[in-house]
Amino acid sequence: MPRSLKKGPFIDLHLLKKVEKAVESGDKKPIKTWSRRSMIIPTMIGLTIAVHNGRQHVPVFVTDEMIGHKLGEFAPTRTYRGHAADKKAKKR
């Protein structure tokens, strides 16, 4: 179920302060964050945000199509290496 419109988008305050500071100064350095739950807002367009995936920070360049999505959607947490090969089929 989506978030109520009367509540507005959720964004952690510490991340919002970092974004506003970067926009104000014109800084292009990636902003490190662990806040995967924060929503992407229009002031973030053009910034690179390094989102933590549990192991490392994945750089995410924010574009206008990403507005309304969460930061965690763009930093996958699981790596799929494929299923194990069938050893019986290889012998024949």
Swiss-Prot record:
One GO term (biological process): ribosomal small subunit assembly
Keyword Ribosomal protein applies: yes
Keyword Membrane applies: no
Keywords for this protein: Ribonucleoprotein, Ribosomal protein, RNA-binding, rRNA-binding
UniProt-recorded Gene Ontology molecular function terms: rRNA binding; structural constituent of ribosome
Pfam families with a match to the protein in the record: Ribosomal_S19
A GO CC annotation given for this chain: cytoplasm
Domain of life of the native organism: Bacteria
PROSITE patterns: RIBOSOMAL_S19 (PS00323)
Known function: Protein S19 forms a complex with S13 that binds strongly to the 16S ribosomal RNA.
Family that this chain belongs to: Belongs to the universal ribosomal protein uS19 family.
Protein name as catalogued: Small ribosomal subunit protein uS19
UniProt source species: Vibrio parahaemolyticus serotype O3:K6 (strain RIMD 2210633)
